[in-house]
Swiss-Prot record:
InterPro entries: Ribosomal_bL9/RNase_H1_N, RNase_H1_N, RNase_H1_N_sf. The inclusion bodies are the site of viral DNA synthesis, virion assembly and accumulation in the infected cell. Residues 488-522 are annotated as: Disordered. Belongs to the caulimoviridae viroplasmin family. Enhances the ribosomal termination-reinitiation event leading to the translation of major open reading frames on the polycistronic viral RNAs. This is Transactivator/viroplasmin protein. It comes from Cauliflower mosaic virus (strain D/H) (CaMV).
Length: 522
């Protein structure tokens, strides 16, 4: 009978809880539908909650029994044969839902405050904290002098404006204000025009050659017409333009004047060897490879002392560069030793149509000791276009002398031989037959009156005197033919033939180019 009362009381409690849950469901459904319905629901639910609360408070069982005695000490568990639904077991209600307090029904959402929505402005949008956002930083570069002086905001444009032009000063700044202040201070000291700001899209292309970079004036900006001409969307981006393979007469004259007037100030990567008529470059480590390339094409180099990575000669002809690399790896034990390239060369020859003759080179490669540069002196440069042929004859004679001296050297290794270039180095062994044959073939092909690309009687006369000193003989059918014509004309006119070589500016005959033969060391 006692168990039935407990079960009935538990049933009432559960029914009250069920009513309470239903009231909460109705409250949730009616929330927001209408204010009147919500107020009525609030007036009804407190009564039910009070009933549930009073039932829980006034509930007392008719009889309370203590825990039966246990057979062993320390065991406080109940007897499994007796009911365990006692008042002490029913202190908390056996449900997962929290009992509502009457005050909760007076506050919506069970007393949890709802934050008020802030009114968003239609024009002002809240910004995020920018402490963690990294914005790209733009540097500014000031090119103080040179043909493309100005203020740039792109390193690629700055590099194109300064690469290959020695003596150009440039510096990086973090802001445009600092760059403008530095540029204005420089132009004020130098009393030159104010430097313009050149954005990335408006940078002009780099000049084609080293000589043009220093001689050509800066290009003026084009002024677009407002009527009749459509302005393009953007100017072309700067590019890296390779050097032209053929050197022009203007480039040669500029380089000739540059090396003649160089006094050694401001550039420690080169020094000069000065003679009466011509001066030659001597390039040291970290020299400008583009300048080395153009001086090589002009025949104005005496010696090159490259770095271990050979960056100074990277623009020389590929076969010459490969021969130098093979020398470092195959011919010397310590590949970290410094080397040198000693060059004997002719100079180019031009006609009205353009380049007639490219320089011929004999290059010796060897291990370099300590470089002691000679003092560079500023020499007078009064060469004219009319003097180029005479200068070409002079360098041609010196080239022939250097080539014939190879016959006196008994230990030579030929690294590379082509139609116009011979590269050799010293050897610990005697010159073998293959290398000797390569040298003789190159001498027979090059040593002639057509050395400079045209038949030059002065060259023939020099070869004849040089060979006669060695006990040999030299004949040129062009000179014999011209001599016979002169003798016939003298006999008819009653004049005598003048002795000595004919003038160098005789009729230019195109050089007969023989087949190219090459020898490379694997």
């Amino acid at each position: 009978m006692e168990n039935i009362e407990k079960l009935l009381m538990q049933e009432k409690i559960l029914m009250l809880e069920l009513d309470l849950v239903r009231a909460k469901i109705s409250l949730a459904r009616a929330n927001g539908s209408s204010q009147q319905g919500e107020l009525s629901l609030h007036r009804e639910t407190p009564e039910k909650e009070v009933a549930v609360h009073s039932a829980l408070v006034t509930f007392t069982p008719t009889q309370v029994k203590a825990i039966p005695e246990q057979t062993a000490p320390g065991k406080e568990s109940t007897n499994p044969l007796m009911a365990s639904i006692l008042p002490k077991d029913m202190n908390p209600v056996q449900t997962g839902t929290r009992l509502a307090v009457p005050s909760d029904f007076l506050r919506p959402h069970q007393g949890i405050p709802i934050p008020q929505k802030s009114e968003l402005s239609s024009t002002v949008v809240p910004l995020r904290a920018e402490s963690g956002i990294q914005h790209p930083h733009i540097n500014y570069y000031v090119v103080y002098n040179g043909p493309h002086a100005g203020i740039y905001d792109d390193w690629g444009c700055t590099k194109a404006a300064t690469n290959g032009v020695p003596g150009v000063a440039h510096k990086k700044f973090a802001t445009i204000t600092e760059a403008r202040a530095a540029a204005d201070a420089y132009t004020t000291r130098q009393q030159t025009d104010r430097l313009n700001f050149i954005p990335k899209g408006e940078a002009q292309l780099k000049p084609k050659s080293f000589a043009e970079a220093l001689t050509s004036p800066p290009k003026q900006k084009a002024h677009w017409l407002t009527l009749g001409t459509k302005k393009p969307s953007s100017d072309p981006a700067p590019k890296e333009i390779s050097f032209a393979p053929e050197i022009t007469m203007d480039d040669f004259l500029y380089l000739y004047d540059l090396v003649r007037k160089f006094d050694g100030e401001g550039d420690d990567t080169m020094f000069t060897t000065d003679n009466e008529k011509i001066s030659l470059f001597n390039f040291r480590k970290n020299a400008n490879p583009q300048m080395v390339r153009e001086a090589y094409a002009a025949g104005l180099i005496k010696t090159i002392y490259p770095s271990n990575n050979l960056q100074e000669i990277k623009y020389l002809p590929k076969k010459v560069k490969d021969a130098v690399k093979r020398f470092r790896t195959n011919c010397i034990k310590n590949t970290e030793k410094d080397i040198f390239l000693k060059i004997r060369s002719t100079i180019p020859v031009w006609t009205i149509q353009g380049l007639l003759h490219k320089p011929r080179q004999v290059i010796e490669i060897g291990v370099s000791k300590k470089v002691i540069p000679t003092e560079s002196k500023a020499m007078e440069s009064r060469i004219q276009i009319e003097d180029l042929t005479e200068l070409a004859v002079k360098t041609g004679e010196q080239f022939i002398q250097s080539l014939l001296r190879l016959n006196d050297k008994k230990k030579i290794f030929v690294n590379m031989v082509e139609h116009d270039t011979l590269v050799y180095s010293k050897n610990i062994k005697e010159t073998d037959s293959e290398d000797q044959r390569a040298i003789e073939t190159f001498q027979q092909r090059v040593i002639s009156g057509n050395l400079l690309g045209f038949h030059c009687p002065a060259i023939c006369h020099f070869i004849m005197k040089t060979v006669e000193k060695e006990g040999g003989a030299y004949k040129c059918h062009h000179c014999d033919k011209g001599k016979a014509i002169v003798q016939d004309a003298s006999a008819d006119e009653g004049t005598t033939d003048k002795s000595g070589p004919p003038p160098t500016r005789s009729i230019v005959e195109k050089e007969d180019v023989p087949n190219t033969s090459s020898k490379q060391v694997d």
